[in-house]
Amino acid sequence: MIIWLAELLQPYFSFFRLFEYLSFRAILSVLTALGLSLWMGPRLIKRLQLLQIGQVVRNEGPESHFSKRGTPTMGGVMILAAISITILLWANLSNPYVWAVLAVLMGYGAVGFVDDYRKVVRKNTDGLIARWKYFWQSAIALVVAFALYAYGKDTAATQLVVPFFKDVMPQLGLMYIVLTYFVIVGTSNAVNLTDGLDGLAIMPTVLVAAGFAVIAWATGNVNFSQYLHIPYLPHASELVVVCTAIVGAGLGFLWFNTYPAQVFMGDVGSLALGGALGTIAVLVRQELVLVIMGGVFVMETLSVILQVGSYKLRGQRIFRMAPIHHHYELKGWPEPRVIVRFWIISMVLVLIGLATLKVR
């Protein structure tokens, strides 16, 4: 929005030329999203407390979590509002990639909102029925996948970039739709599974978004994309503003979500953020790098799959409790130790993911 206004005013005020620079808008994006989150946080927390919208804690969970019962939840509304407002302000709204991410962010946010509403307002601990949750997640992902395929059919936008290999970029064809579906839905649910401790999900989300900001910038720059042997996608550079909005909003939320948390993001936040990360990975053609940079999310998801599979096949559990962060809690690790160590792992994995751009 601002970029359109700047274009109109440039002939009269040279200052507005600054808004042409992606780096300048990226900085403003971080600061705007951060400021909005910090401003909305206390007000939203107070409102949630008045409405008695508090976290539901299952009795079979770790005993240390019982004290979290009643902590305000659905704080993801604040994150989504900060991200959306920031994107509308600082991004180039004629860019289709921006709207693709916004569509998934708000669509998955709506699914998460209904799920949270049923849990905390209707007092239904199961929330939205699983089949309906997956139906709407799938519907949104497929609509976006078909739209992106139609837009970039048989171009670099539908190639698969394989890390560590310079010239291995097969054209996916219709398999692009299948891959896009699984990346968006899978990442959304992986972040949702990770969101079990104070700040555990939001910091890796911030780190991965920051990593994708770098990748989006390189992918959208003709010189750097050629130098790094990755597809040149001119629309991708605008995703830098989207990624930095996620970083700013996430850091602002972490201010209130750090241990001991004053508010939880709920499914409205985790499903939406995961879906947005998956969409960004698809748009910059780095789905496999997402597996590396989002390794904490992958680890949490695999722990659940292995736990369920082992119990059904052998009648035995691999972990004391899944997702795996609960396993370490039950081993006696204090919650802050689990959280910070997972953050460190995430930071290392993001750096490894960025290194794949050069190591080919």
Curated annotation (Swiss-Prot):
Record-level GO BP terms: cell division; cell wall organization; peptidoglycan biosynthetic process; regulation of cell shape
Protein's pathway: Cell wall biogenesis; peptidoglycan biosynthesis
Cellular compartments annotated: Cell inner membrane
GO MF assignments: metal ion binding; phospho-N-acetylmuramoyl-pentapeptide-transferase activity; UDP-N-acetylmuramoyl-L-alanyl-D-glutamyl-meso-2,6-diaminopimelyl-D-alanyl-D-alanine:undecaprenyl-phosphate transferase activity
EC number from the UniProt entry: 2.7.8.13
Class of this enzyme: transferase
Keywords of this entry: Cell cycle, Cell division, Cell inner membrane, Cell membrane, Cell shape, Cell wall biogenesis/degradation, Magnesium, Membrane, Metal-binding, Peptidoglycan synthesis, Transferase, Transmembrane, Transmembrane helix
Domain of life: Bacteria
Enzymatic reactions: UDP-N-acetyl-alpha-D-muramoyl-L-alanyl-gamma-D-glutamyl-meso-2,6-diaminopimeloyl-D-alanyl-D-alanine + di-trans,octa-cis-undecaprenyl phosphate = di-trans,octa-cis-undecaprenyl diphospho-N-acetyl-alpha-D-muramoyl-L-alanyl-D-glutamyl-meso-2,6-diaminopimeloyl-D-alanyl-D-alanine + UMP
Residues spanning the membrane: 21-41, 73-93, 94-114, 132-152, 168-188, 199-219, 236-256, 263-283, 288-308, 338-358
Main location: membrane
InterPro entries the UniProt entry points to: Glycosyl_transferase_4, PNAcMuramoyl-5peptid_Trfase, PNAcMuramoyl-5peptid_Trfase_CS
Cofactors (names): Mg(2+)
Annotated membrane topology: Multi-pass membrane protein
A cellular component annotation (GO) from this entry: plasma membrane
Function: Catalyzes the initial step of the lipid cycle reactions in the biosynthesis of the cell wall peptidoglycan: transfers peptidoglycan precursor phospho-MurNAc-pentapeptide from UDP-MurNAc-pentapeptide onto the lipid carrier undecaprenyl phosphate, yielding undecaprenyl-pyrophosphoryl-MurNAc-pentapeptide, known as lipid I.
Family: Belongs to the glycosyltransferase 4 family. MraY subfamily.
Protein name per UniProt: Phospho-N-acetylmuramoyl-pentapeptide-transferase
Gene (UniProt): mraY
